[in-house]
Amino acid sequence: MKKIFGFGRKKKGDPPPGSTASPCPAGAYELRQKELGKLHRAAAAGDLAQVRQGLKKHGVDGRDKAQRTPLHLACANGHADVVTFLVESKCKLNLFDNDNRSPLMKAVQCQQEKCVAILLEHGADPNLADANGNTALHLAAVAPNTFLAGMLIEHNAHIDAQNKEGCTPLTLAVSEHRQEMVELLLKKGADVNARDLCERTPLMTAASGGELKLVKVLLRYGADLSHKDTNGWTAEDYAIIHGYDSLSNQLAEYADWENTGEASAGATRGISVPMTPHKARAAGFTLGAPAVDRGEEKIVKNTEEERNSLLSRHQEQENQGKVFCTVVF
């Protein structure tokens, strides 16, 4: 899956090593002091006295060259007292910077919990989207910060909001291997079968990464094993394509069990899939041990043949212009 956040990457215009830029948490702005006005510098530094003084001469919503307001900078750097003062001074809460991110998004991205709480309590919109279509909840899912995610959901953040690739916060949490976040979102009602622009589900994403624990969590909440994406592939196919032969065999066993209520002996030696209100029927099946009862050598050979067949068919479709989504290795 394409990475669309860019956390930790060096952006054009970032100061070179050894330059005098303000230290910042992950996701925060890289700042050159000389490029900021007095009010913006004071907000970024958390100097409340200077912020008070600056408001006598400058508008509370003044922008710098990157379209950041003092509130953006105070939120990114976690200066809750400055945030409170600016909010009480009637600053606008939902203005965008150059990346189309609001102060709330920056506070979430930088995991400034007090600032997030202040903004939400004063009516900041949790459902605004940045240049990539990500909302504050997408950013919390990737952080990952379950406390912030829970707070956003309590303030009516759309739990199944889709970014420009069609990914929901759940899909991103799965792609980043964040099991605690995945479980929180599912408990809060996230769609376990949400589909991106290529019709891929979170289960397919988990299978692509060989994430057995996440696969089990998703199955407990009713993930659909039979669903096919725009290439006609299932989660089992994705496990095969990415070389997770044991997982693909277990998914096949699970599908057989769902359809017939019976599973082979090899599929019953793994870790049980606990019963939940969402997936009570999964209590009778175990997932986790290699399904070796059909002959291990034969399985390896068959999955290798299946992988080659799938990739060959994909190449043929691609040559004919019928492929909408490519394989990501």
Description of each model-found segment:
Residues 1-38, 155, 188, 220-224, ...:
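Ankyrin-repeat-protein effector appendages
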Residues 34, 65-66, 98-99, 131-132, ...:
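Ankyrin repeat start-site detector
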